[in-house]
Regions:
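Single conserved hydrophobic/aromatic residue that forms the stacking wall/gate
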Residues: 1-11
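Nucleotide/phosphate-binding catalytic cleft detector across ATP-hydrolyzing
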Residues: 9-169, 177-295, 301-343
Length: 343
């Protein structure tokens, strides 16, 4: 029942102000940002469920530990493939779970939620994300494209009439965009990103060293000694895997110079995509970018030497955002404030 709008009511409304939440719905992980608290949750986008009963067994980190280790009736899946919803019902349940987990149980008023999607998604896919978010308990939903979220999170003032180029390298996709006046002017999304770096290392180790390694090991190599550009001093690490000839465990020493060779093809494709976006950029905005530089975000941007490589191939100053992993989540959360400010 509608109460009379007295002072007490105004006070009550103040204390019941709803929460603003930003969700970075990534192929590899999901991050939840809450206004005033920052990023409160970061978990793998994995769901494990029982085939026979269709009941969900685990979500997030708990489910990731089950990947490749489950008995026949339990399957662990990643419902988002290359930034696209491949399984709608599972995604909806996953969203619900993470929203509740991030907020805790005390929700007086439904939250306003903004969700970030890769720039290449179709209207149908956007609608699916929107529906899933409403189903998960949102009062209002705003869908934001990844490059814009990344730009806000990287601290760029996107409302100005000035060209900024953002390159967001995630797990499944790399989004490249030129942004001005709060919108995307030119953009492209390629399905070459962090996951492909790992796969390239696996292929290289097999070809060059006859060594079979798993995804976790490949990611380890990428993080510790992965390189996109020749550096003055090469670093190395010992890798354990299975020798393909003898079938027995073996240790091989790998150097950063080798990882550069392994990753050449994938990094070249990212540079190529940056080129094609620059070629389509209107001259005034291109001049802004030459002046202000290219900003990298996303987990994939942490690859050593990537800035130097892009700089050498484009001739444009390139820098990585302060906290590239969480830039998209933070930007998604702040986007709601940006929208509210425009009303």
């Amino acid at each position: 029942p509608e109460m009379s709008r007295g002072l007490g009511d105004v006070y009550k409304r103040q204390t019941m102000i709803s929460t603003d939440i930003g969700i970075d719905l990534g192929t590899a992980s999901i991050l939840v940002y809450i206004k005033g608290k920052g990023v409160v949750l970061k978990e793998p986008s994995v769901v494990a469920f029982d085939r026979d009963t269709n009941k969900i067994k685990a979500i997030g980190e708990e489910a990731r530990l089950m990947l490749g280790r489950t008995p026949g009736n339990i399957v662990a899946v990643r419902p988002l493939r290359q930034g696209v919803i491949s399984d709608y019902t599972v995604t909806e349940k996953m969203l619900k779970y993470f929203i509740q987990k991030a907020l805790g149980k005390k929700i007086l008023k439904k939250p306003r939620i903004s969700v970030c999607v890769p720039s290449g998604v179709t209207e149908v896919e956007k609608k699916a994300v929107e529906d899933a978010t409403y189903q998960a308990g949102a009062r209002e939903v705003a869908i934001i494209e990844e490059p814009i979220a990344a730009a806000i999170g990287a601290g760029i003032d996107i409302s100005r009439p000035c060209g900024n180029m953002i390159v967001d390298i995630g797990g499944g996709t790399t989004d490249i965009a030129v942004i001005s006046l709060g919108g995307t002017v030119v953009s492209t999304s390629i399905k070459i990103a962090g996951d492909d770096f790992d796969e390239a290392i696996i292929r290289y180790m097999r070809k060059k060293h006859n060594l079979l390694i798993g995804e976790r090991t490949a990611e380890d190599i990428k993080i510790k000694i992965g390189s996109a550009y020749p550096s003055a001093e090469a670093v190395s690490m010992d890798i354990r895997g299975r020798n393909l000839v003898t079938g027995l465990p073996k240790t091989v020493t790998v150097t950063s110079t080798e990882t550069e060779e392994a990753l050449k093809e994938a990094t070249a494709q990212i540079v190529e995509a940056i080129h094609s976006v620059l070629e389509k950029t209107p001259p005034e905005l291109a001049a802004d970018i030459a002046d202000r530089g290219i900003v990298l975000t996303g987990g994939g941007s942490l690859l050593q030497g990537l800035e130097e490589l892009i700089e050498e191939k484009t001739g444009i100053n390139t820098m990585t955002a302060e906290d590239p992993m969480t830039a998209v989540a933070i930007g998604t959360g702040k986007f709601i404030e940006f929208l509210a400010g425009e009303r």
